[in-house]
Amino acid sequence: MEGLGEEIADFVEYASPDADELRARFATMRRLDSVAKALWPGSEAEPFGSTKHRMLLHGSDLDVRIRTVGKFENIPECHGINQLGAEVMKQPWAVDMDPKVTGRVPQISYVDSISKLRCKVCVGNRQTVRGTSFFNSPMIPLSMRFPAFKVLMLPVKTVFKQRGLEKSFAGGVGTFRVGMMLLNYLAMHAPASTRPPTPDVLGGALIGFFRYYASAPADGSEWQKWTEPFAF
């Protein structure tokens, strides 16, 4: 277990964005922010989800919400995203535009040609706020009880991504669902899961997580104890 835990720690360091990428992400968001402010004075581009909480992989998409204020505070989301999309298309740094205005949360997706990052952008303060608040409110405070949570999120997300299962709109599981699965597993294995993220803790928890969701039989150890197989 300790050897696997050391590999997990090395992988997290390798897979996390470095300082240059973090600066590129910030610059990408500032370019979008300037476009939004020209449309809706006082508005602000802000990251959400895994981007905000630093649970992102190197080169992963940049998730941004345009928070509108004042007389634009309650702008209809479809109208807002159409307006923003039209302006973003005029920018020389925006390529490969892909609008999705008919979904539950209308958004535009484009590649920033300077940073090479794909940006996914939504507008407004109603449905989008509820979605990001749902991510922030129950998951992040609860995860603080489990020091290994953020460390394990990256390798777990990578496994789902390698198998093409990271897109929630395509039937997969996005960051929020992966986080809830991991929290559910860690909550079932307290107090072991409340210990510092040492190599043996990381290795045991990662193996136990996949055995649990694979309906593997439990062996009764501190990382593999459940009363019945998990069933989808």
What do the PLM-derived regions correspond to, one by one?
Residues M1-F232:
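Non-catalytic helical "accessory" subdomain of NTase-fold nucleotidyltransferases
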